[in-house]
Amino acid sequence: MEQEIYQNERYKAILTILNRLKKVSVQDLTQRFGVSEVTIRKDLSFLEERGKLVRTHGGAILAEDEGRLRAIAIRQAEHPAEKTAIARRASQLIRSGETVFIDAGSTCAALARTIRDMELRVVTNSLDVLLELVDSPGISLFSTGGSFRPEACSFIGPGALETIRSLQIDTCFMGTTGFSRDGVFSSQNVIESQLKSAVIRASRRAVMLADHSKYGSTAFSVFARAGDIDVLVTDSAFNHTEEVAATGIELVIADVEPVLKVNGS
């Protein structure tokens, strides 16, 4: 029990050091904790499997910018009307019988709610999507598996990557944290980005779902550039159509239904 407690404390300490320095070496950690290189390498492998860091030659780097992470409940509460509109419009791009991938994230979860009555094969790394579609009779549901990342309710890591690389996907529907003006898409987690990139490569068509607020922002790790994405579905508040057209991405606009206000509210 004491060894297990010390091990957990070491995991926390490694992540604290990484958050401060952004990278660590096996040699430095060995000296800090007074344990063998084998032990430190096992620690780094354990943390990598859980999406906390990325192994490098002789050490590790931080997998995500924890200072910019937000709870999934907060993200789900942002721009709900826009996300619903985007999801409905994106569902019109799906043909019956297709194999589609639905990414993790609040907009992609909204997409899952709109396709419950369709006949499809759905591959996903999202717990929310799995729960949304688990009782849909026409949906053949397939999970990537992998290590669970609570911050995003998603599965990532080597197991998920291996699954994706063995599949052929007709259309993938992807979410993004960052969408820069020059058509670069990014997320807050390196290992998550690795999976996103693999999904896009495994797909005949890549569709990005992003509300207008994402435009002009950047995140920690790039997973796609304009040439990798076929279609961008966004909401009617998006006013950068010429910039997107210049990147070669097809732009699809979703009309957002006005919110009706009740008298006295």
Mark where each language-model region is.
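Ser/Thr-centric signal marking residues that sit
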Residues: 39, 56, 99, 107-108, ...
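HTH-adjacent hinge/linker in prokaryotic transcriptional regulators
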Residues: 2-27, 31-104, 112-116, 121, ...
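Conserved phosphate- and dinucleotide-binding cores of soluble alpha/beta proteins
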Residues: 2-12, 16, 20-29, 34, ...
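Hydrophobic alpha-helical segments
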Residues: 40, 84-88, 105, 109, ...
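Generic secondary-structure boundary signal with a strong preference for alpha-helix termini
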Residues: 63, 70-71, 102, 109, ...
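Short glycine/serine/threonine-rich phosphate/pyrophosphate-binding segments
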Residues: 107-111, 215-218
